[in-house]
Amino acid sequence: MRRRGVYVMLTLCGVLTTALIAFLVLFLTGGQGANASGAPTVRVELSHSQGEVLGNYGFTAWTNQMFMQFRGIPFAEPPTAELRFRPPVARSPWTGTLNALNFGQRCPVITNLDGQLSDAELEDCLNLSVYTKNLTASQPVMFYIYGGGYYNGSAEDHPPNYILEKDVVLVVPQYRVGALGWLSTYTEELPGNAPIADILMALEWVQLHINHFGGDPQKVTIFGQSAGAGVASSLLLSPQTGDSLFKRAIVQSGSIFASWAINKDPRAQSMRICVQLGCSRCDEEDQLVECLRNAKVLDVLRITTTESFSPIVGDLQGILPQQPSELVKSYRRQIPLLTGFTQHDGSFVLASYYDALAAKVSNVSSLTVRQFSQGIYDLNNDTSGLTGNTLNRLLFKREILNSHDHSAAVPSYFDLTSTIFMKSPVITLATRIHTLQPSTPVYLYSFEYEGKYTRFGYEFGNSHYPFNGGVHHSNDNIYLFATHTLEGQDMQMSKKMVEVWTSFAIDGIPSELSPLTSASGPYNQLNLEITKEEDLLETLTSAIDDPENGRLQREDMEF
Ligand SMILES: *[C@@H]1O[C@H](CO)[C@@H](O)[C@H](O)[C@H]1NC(C)=O
Ligand SMILES: *[C@@H]1O[C@H](CO)[C@@H](O)[C@H](O)[C@H]1NC(C)=O
Ligand SMILES: *[C@@H]1O[C@H](CO)[C@@H](O)[C@H](O)[C@H]1NC(C)=O
Ligand SMILES: *[C@@H]1O[C@H](CO)[C@@H](O)[C@H](O)[C@H]1NC(C)=O
Ligand SMILES: *[C@@H]1O[C@H](CO)[C@@H](O)[C@H](O)[C@H]1NC(C)=O
Ligand SMILES: *[C@@H]1O[C@H](CO)[C@@H](O)[C@H](O)[C@H]1NC(C)=O
């Protein structure tokens, strides 16, 4: 809630300042004017007679530069009715001026549904937002793919006021999330990976139209975080990604090599959901399709709150025709890559595992440390037990493993969850690509700054956990998108992050970072100062090796 409050504050400041400069703007360039209520607006004509869009103004966070914003430009037809689950269809041209003054509808999420809207309106979410300072320039384009566990996320959650301090154009497309995007039966009607196809279509839109917004279509950087990292790394490996769509990539916290990044049995999932919708004959393809396609948005969302969704291998569009571990073998792109994780990127998995366990076992501490960690390995489905055996040896002292001393094990739990779910998949992506294409730079980072704000417990609160969140998953984004009011060192950190990310987008070299020279390193620790460290596998033991790791345990609460 705090985040929304801050965002509203930013918007309000924008509106006030807007009034002050309205006069100035009116006389700047053609295409700019004012709407009926006197607020300044700007018109842009798209290519190929697609139509005209009307935008307005925002202001950067630190130097109050004015930028133009076009929020909610549709790039695809609403994926509703017979288009539901199907690859996106390009938006047909419109006549007159289309208002892009506010964000379009987010793709349906159970917690954010507007009950007044019809399903067709709710599903009309394939809009993108463009932020730019100069319509006639030719600036590098940063194309952000949001995270949200493949079931959440929106353009609105990513205010541009830090990134627009630099001379770049920011594009934030929306893509389908949850069942309405990811369900598949490997058939024409439910081909799979529709959300990745949404992103591909938005990238094509950028190629066609971004020059009208002052962006250079030859200089597009994709960046994605968490589930968005899964999508961004899929685009890197996919044979369906044309070579001109983007020239650099940033993959934050996760990759398509993670076990959570691929849905192994979407067909069974589709049938399960069909049955839960109360339909009959869910084992017959046409009945199944009819059921899923005609289901009310609210019903689909309501019965899928405990399902997880993600990309699939073998979709009919050929986006991921083989396992990522196979696809990477023929990787030939020359795309500079910046990838990494937060220092304690897995602590959110520890938290949700803890919640799930506490719901089943009345006293979590009655489990031994070994039993507790086994449950985490089980989430990863490694049937050989190799992961568990090796990580038990690496991360736990022998005497702790058979004890109930969970407090002492907290740093080990941090390293274990971070390694399995985030760090190892990122390191695999980075080192496989570096090894195959040594002449293309790969930069690896560990984000280690601990500031005032955290995303720990953002959704459900964090006061009930017997541990703290550390440098939590998504905390890096606090410094890239203007969701909080940052001061002092936090603002300095934000300036550093924006400098690194945008310098990479501008010339392919992230300011102050060192590229991999071998599969062992070096890597870069991102903090108020950036430091180069030689051995990247040291990141896997970063919590247990930390002399100050006592702060990860809660002082006021027994585990
Ligand atoms: C005029 O622009 C303001 C801000 O740009 C917007 O909030 C308002 O809805 C617009 N009014 C009309 C009539 O389009
Ligand atoms: C997507 O954006 C377009 C243009 O602003 C708008 O017409 C459309 O209604 C938006 N979709 C929703 C559901 O808001
Ligand atoms: C989705 O994200 C929004 C905005 O961050 C949040 O308000 C909402 O609670 C989230 N929904 C779920 C189901 O996590
Ligand atoms: C916008 O970009 C053009 C082309 O680079 C340049 O000539 C112009 O001065 C820029 N305008 C502003 C306000 O910076
Ligand atoms: C929970 O289990 C631990 C370890 O067996 C034990 O020390 C503790 O007293 C138990 N707590 C409760 C409330 O039963
Ligand atoms: C892990 O395996 C179990 C049992 O085979 C299965 O039900 C579950 O879906 C699997 N989870 C993942 C993430 O593959």
What is each of the regions a protein language model found here?
Residues L298-M491, V500, D507:
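Substrate-gating cap/lid region and adjacent catalytic-acid/histidine neighborhood
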Residues D243-S255:
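A conserved short beta-strand
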Residues A229-T241:
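Short glycine-enriched nucleophile-adjacent loop
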Residues P140, F213-S226:
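Alpha/beta-hydrolase fold nucleophile elbow
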Residues R2-V6, L436-T440, E450-G451, E487-F559:
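Alpha/beta-hydrolase-fold serine-hydrolase catalytic core, especially in secreted/extracellular enzymes
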Residues Q174, F223, S238, I250-S253, ...:
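Alpha/beta-hydrolase-fold catalytic nucleophile elbow
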Residues P191-H212, A268-C274:
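Alpha/beta-hydrolase active-site loop
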Residues R2-I196, P217, D490-M497, A505-S514, ...:
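Non-catalytic accessory segments of hydrolases
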